[in-house]
Amino acid sequence: MKKSKNVCVAVVSLCLFGTQLFSQEKAQEKKMEQLEEIVIYATKFELKKENTGKVIYKISQKDIQRNAGKSVIELLNNVLGIEIRGVNSNPGEPRSTYIRGGRSRQALVLIDGIPLSDPTGIEQSYDLRLISLNQIESIEILKGASSTLYGSGAGTGVINIILKKASENTVSGVYEVSLGTNATSKNSTSSLNDKNQNISINGTLDKLKYNAFFNITGNSGFSSAKSTLTIPFEEDTYSSNNGFLKLGYEFNTQLRMDAFLNYDEFDYTFDAGAYNDSDVNLGNQEQFRIGIRPRLKYKKGEVFLNASINSLDRSFESFNSFSGGTNVFIYKGTSVNLDFVNKYEFTKNFQLITGINYQKHENESISDFGNIDPDLANFNVVDPYVSAVYITDFGLSINAGSRLNIHSNYGNNFVYDTNLAFGIVKNETITLKLISSYSTAFIAPSLYQLFSDYGATNLAPETNRTFEFGFDSKLGKQWALSAVYYNRLEENKVIFQNLPTPPYGMYANALETIDVSGIEADVTFTISEELITTVGYAFVDKTSDIDYIPKNKLTASFVVNPIKNLAISTMFKNVGKRSFFDAFGSFGEAGKDVILPSYSLLDMNVNYKVLEGKVLFFGSITNLLNEEYEETIGFNTRGRNFKMGIRIQF
C-alpha cells in the first residue's frame, strides 16, 4: 500500500510540475480546434455542435494518439455515461456496451455512417472487438433515442466510428509495433504476452485517394475463468487480423465516389463458465464488408447513397459435460444496407433532410441443438424518414423529424424526435447553451428471437423513449461545465420465458415498463494550456434489469505537456457497486442479488515525439495500483500491466 501511495504522489507531482509550463503554439492550436468543432454525423451532414440539442461526445484523433496501444472499447469505457462490461477481462470473452443503463442491443454502431449488426447473434448487436483502433480517425457518441435518422437499435445511443482518410501526399505511411504484459493482479509476470503491429499506406494520385491498412494482434497470459484454488487455470489465447482498403475518386468538385473493402477475423479460446476451466473450448469469428458511397453536391444541397454488404461467420466448439464430447456451433449471417439521403437547403438557416433506408438480414445456424434455415430466418425493412433543421439568428436551433419503419415480419412502426438548443450567452467571457430533446426509438427482434426453436414470429419491436434537459457552459478560458438529466422508458422488451414443456423456453415481449433516470455532469479546468483536468460523474437509477449496471461512476483525467513533444495523461475511474440476480443460487442464495463491490482504476500514458513528430515513442501502465476486482462474477480481470511501443511515419 505504501508503494501505491508513493506512485500516486509521483503522478500528482508530475501534473503539478506541468502547471508551470506554457506553450503559445499549443494555445493557438487548441483555440482553432474549439472554433472549428463540428459534429459530422449528428444529422448525417456537417453541423456545428452549438446547433444541436443532443448530447454528443467526440473522441478526437488527439485522444486516440494520446492513448496509443489501447483498444476501441477501452477508449469508449472512459466516456461519461458508457460502461463496457468485460473491458478488462480476457480478450476472448464477449463485451457488453451499456449506454445510460441500457444494453448492447440498444446501442447502435456505425462505421462511416453505415449501421452494423451481427445477424447471427441472439440480440443482433455488433461486436466492437472486430475493429482496430488504429483504423480510426475519430469516434462520435450521440446519446439518447435516435431511431429517426438511424433506425433499429438506436435506443440509448449511437457510436459512429469514422475511419482515417488518405493523406494529400502521393505516398504516406505509418508503421506501429507494441509489446506489453498481460496478467491478473494475483499472477503478475514480466512476459510480453500482449503483442500488436500494424501498417498503413495511403495517399493521393491525381483524383484518386487510397488508404490501405493491416493489423495483427496476439494476446495470452491468463485464464478467462477465475480459479478458486491456489493454482491458476490454464491460459486462454486471443489473436486477430484486421485489414481494409478504402478508395475515393473525385470526378469534379460536385461528384465523388468512395468504395471500401474490409476484413476482420479473430480466434480465441474460452472457459466453461464462472470459476470453471476448459482446455478444449475454442472459437473463431470472421467479418467481410464491402460497400460504395457516391456523393453529389448541387446548388442547394447534396445527395449520397450508402450501399454495403456485411457477411459474418461465427463458429465455436465447447465441451459437453453430459456426453463427454464437444458440441459444434456454426453461424452464418448476411446484412444488406442501402441508405439514400438528400439534404436540401431552402435558406442558410433552414435545411430539410429526407431519406429512405432498405435493409435485409438473414441467418443460417447449424448446431447439435437445432438448425436455422436462411430461407426462413430473414426479414427486410423499408424505412422512409425526414428531418428538418432550423437555425435562428438569435441563438435558437430546432431539429425535428420522423421515421416510418416498415418491417416484413411485424408490420409498421412510427418513431419521431425533436431537440432544441438555445444559446443564451455567447462572448469571450462566458457561453451558456441550454439543450433539450424528446425522442423515440425501436429495437427490432433479432433473427434468432424470431426464427430459432425458441423464437416467436409474433414478437413486436421493443420501444424506447428518451427525454433530456441540460446545459453546456464555458467560463473564460479556464472552466467548461456541462450537465444533463435524462429519463428513459423501455417497453415491449424481448425476454426469454422458461416453460415446463419442450422446448422449455420461448421469447416473448415483456409486459413490464422499465423506467430509467440519470444525471451526467462534467467539468474541465484548464490550469494552463499544458495542464488540463476533467472530472465527470454519471448516475443511473433503473427500476429493473440492473445486472452489472453501476449506479455511480466517477472519472477524472489529467493531461500534461511538461516539455515540448512530451505528453503525459492519467485516467482515474471509480465504478460503483453492481448487482447480479442469482436465479438458481449458483453464487449464493437462489432468488437473491449478489453484490459486487465498487473498484477504482488508475491508468497512465506517456508519449514522446522526435524527428519533427515522425517518430512517436509511447508507453502505458494500466491498473497502476494493481486493484483486484470482478467485472463479471467468476471471471478474471487484468491487474497492473505495462505496454511500450513505437510509431513511425514515412
Predicted ranges, named:
Residues N252, T347-I353, N357-N363, F369-E490, ...:
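Structural signature of Gram-negative outer-membrane beta-barrels, strongest in the C-terminal barrel
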Residues E25, N219-A225, L229-F244, G248-S335:
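Flexible loop and strand-edge segments within Gram-negative outer membrane beta-barrel domains
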Residues E176, I391-I398, Y485-L489, N509-A583, ...:
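Gram-negative outer-membrane beta-barrel transporters
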Residues I73, N77-P115:
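Extracytoplasmic beta-strand/coil segments of soluble accessory domains associated
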Residues C8-V12, S23, N90, N202-L205, ...:
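Conserved C-terminal beta-signal and adjacent last beta-strands/turns
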